[in-house]
Amino acid sequence: MKYLLGEKLSFDWKIVTVTVGSTLLLMVDHYYKITPFKYWDRVILYLIIPLFIILILFRENPKEYGFSFGDWKLGLTYTALGILSMAPIIYFLGSGNTSMQKYYEPYLHGLPWTTFLDLICWEFFFRGWILFAYSRKFGHNALWLQAVPFALAHVGKPEIETLSTIFGGFAFGWVAWRTKSFVWPFLIHWFIATFIILVASGAI
């Protein structure tokens, strides 16, 4: 029996919880509709449930998972640099792109509130909960590890955007890592997403 089963396996239960939990939450988001609005679904799935697990199951302070302003001076600097560098790139790639226009035109309604709710939850999920949980075990490699599910969550979006997300996810993770906060990558991501919708739809 020992030959068949092999050596005894040992796992970090928090890593297992975050890995399995985040995978299931992403799948639930894809297959189910909890509320009439997708962004409220994501508040539940990507913010409330992870916070509940951190507080009740892990018995930890959410600050340990980037739920704070962290190094706010550095964060403001990265946010300004991110917005200034990405704005012309987004305008160049998104302006007149028919596939992006077709995809993003329906998202104009409710801006910027809808992207705010959507992305503050996404950023805590990837750049807070997953990143800082993995960083304890995997160190800097956590930056790439959290970028993988982030990139896969973009499948179905315009190709040029989806292909770039593994690198964008790493960059957002690096900002969160340096500032010890998910807030600053959220602000950059919020600007990028809102600006993409406005440019691709022809609103600006």
Indicate where each model-derived feature is located:
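Structural signal for the C-terminal ends of transmembrane alpha-helices
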Residues: 27-31, 53-63, 89-93, 175-178
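Short, Lys/Arg-rich, polar N-terminal cytosolic tail immediately upstream
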Residues: 1-9
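Membrane-embedded alpha-helical segments of multi-pass membrane proteins
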Residues: 40-52, 108-113, 121, 125, ...
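Alpha-helical transmembrane segments in multi-pass membrane proteins
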Residues: 9-58, 78
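Hydrophobic alpha-helical transmembrane segments
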Residues: 12-20, 75-80, 108-112, 140-148, ...
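Functionally important transmembrane alpha-helices
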Residues: 28-31, 161-204
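Function-critical hydrophobic alpha-helical transmembrane segments in multi-pass membrane proteins
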Residues: 48, 89-91, 101-155
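Membrane-interface helix termini and inter-helical loops of multi-pass transporters
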Residues: 31-37, 62-68, 94-106
